[in-house]
Amino acid sequence: MANAYETWARALRSWATDPTATLDDLPPITAESFNPTVHRRLLKHIERALSIADNRWSETLTNLPATADYHEFERWWLTTRNNLARRMHLCNHPGLPDEIRSTLLSDAQTRIGNWQHHIESILRRSSVAGELPTATEQRIYDLVRSTPLTAVLDPTYGTATRLTHALEQS
């Protein structure tokens, strides 16, 4: 049977490259679970996994629909938010020590807030440049403001969706 470090390292590598991989069933770890060298290696695995996830998410920004179609943008926006929710699941994983979780959550709050601001800025610039019809641009901007990326920072984000899915499966 694999030890906790191997289990976490394998799960993080898989999670970083496979959007369907989960972090469920990982053993809890504490700051004392490993010697300092192994602890640093595990932190590197976490950092690498988050970096890959962030890069993949940033690539979605390049796929920002350059269209006046509100519904296409809405679908893209909700998918984008759900991808960030996956990142938050790692940052807030109950198996991580409080110190690590606190640091990851603080970093996530800053990054996601910055991304929200960046997207709002893009939409404001496109409106000024006249790339979107005024009414559609306003609806898209309102959507981004009323359903912000920062919603994923709430630990209960997605709970209702998961419950609904579970009920539909039963």
Describe the function of each predicted region:
Residues 1-2, 167-170:
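Short intrinsically disordered terminal tails
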Residues 9, 16-154:
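Long, low-complexity or tandemly repetitive, helically biased scaffold regions used
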Residues 157:
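Class I SAM-dependent methyltransferase "Motif I" SAM/SAH-binding loop
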Residues 161-166:
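Conserved S-adenosyl-L-methionine
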